[in-house]
């Protein structure tokens, strides 16, 4: 658990965003990536540790992580699909959207009781079942790399 508190600047995974929110990076680097599923999986690991130990310090870390997700979850919604990260703002693959992002929202809602996670769970499930969204997603998968290339 202590290794999580090593800042990314010195080889760790901890980072704070411009709003002072705590993040654990799946891919620590100079520029923040803020990969949603990597952060949430870290949160779930910390939660398991707290369940075993009951340590209040660990519970405070969980509370900070939940706050981060509550205040940042909107950044992972394109309006028609979930987003993988905040660096490249990659649209999640259908596999990730269906099998990772949606279930993670369900788990976060069950563990925290926070309605915002249930709201995104339902929203993303609805997006998954939209034929229009799936067609638009295929177009965006082709366009996004080109847009990034030309915007540099």
Segments and roles (model prediction):
Residues 7-23, 33-46, 73-74:
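A structural motif
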Residues 61-108:
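Glycine/small-residue-rich hydrophobic helix-like segments
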Residues 26-30, 43, 53, 63-68:
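Long alpha-helical, hydrophobic tracts
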């Amino acid at each position: 658990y202590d290794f999580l508190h090593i800042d990314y600047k010195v080889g760790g995974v901890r980072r704070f965003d411009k709003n002072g929110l705590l993040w654990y990076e799946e891919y620590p680097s100079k520029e923040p990536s803020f990969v949603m599923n990597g952060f949430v999986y870290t949160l779930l690991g910390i939660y398991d540790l707290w369940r075993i130990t009951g340590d209040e310090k660990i519970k405070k870390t969980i509370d900070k992580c939940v706050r981060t997700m509550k205040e940042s979850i909107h950044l992972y919604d394109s309006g028609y699909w979930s987003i993988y990260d905040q660096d490249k703002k990659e649209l999640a693959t259908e596999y990730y959207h269906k099998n990772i992002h949606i279930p993670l929202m369900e788990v976060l809602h069950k563990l925290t009781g926070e309605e915002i996670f249930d709201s995104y769970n339902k929203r993303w499930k609805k997006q998954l079942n939209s034929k229009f969204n799936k067609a638009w997603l295929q177009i965006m998968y082709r366009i996004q790399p080109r847009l990034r290339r030309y915007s540099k």
